[in-house]
Amino acid sequence: WRMVYDNNVNTIVMLTKAREGNEEQSAIYWPSDIGEQMNMKSITVTLVSDETDGPALKRKLKIERGAISRTVTQLHYTGWNSTSCPEDGRDVIELVNKMQENIRSTGDGVALI
């Protein structure tokens, strides 16, 4: 989260499921319940909202460091298995479009993929 905060990241794109079957594919690095907080040293992350937006789950996260807070959007695409590629590329194109829309709507931010 320090890298996200220090580099003014406003959009995170995650392209894998957290779990496939019994295997962990990625650590869950965000709070799971709305209003829940995760504290990592000097940074607090709070889940503000969680909804389905086209091919992705869209999470709004508030990152606080001291008195400064920022909003980060995570677009979590779960249609890409670790052993294959998406059957329909249109979902990936829609995801890229949603990422670009989010970057434009929030100003001078950076995307982390």
Swiss-Prot record:
Top enzyme class: hydrolase
Catalytic reaction(s) noted: O-phospho-L-tyrosyl-[protein] + H2O = L-tyrosyl-[protein] + phosphate
Keyword Hydrolase attached: yes
Family label: Belongs to the protein-tyrosine phosphatase family.
Gene name of this polypeptide: STY-15
InterPro entries hit by this protein: Prot-tyrosine_phosphatase-like, Protein-Tyr_Phosphatase, PTP_cat
GO molecular function: protein tyrosine phosphatase activity
PROSITE patterns (UniProt xref): TYR_PHOSPHATASE_PTP
The protein's name: Tyrosine-protein phosphatase 15
Hydrolase as UniProt keyword: yes
Signal sequence range: none
Keywords: Hydrolase, Protein phosphatase
E.C. number: 3.1.3.48
CDD domains: PTPc
Residue ranges of every copy of the Tyrosine-protein phosphatase domain listed in the record: 1-113
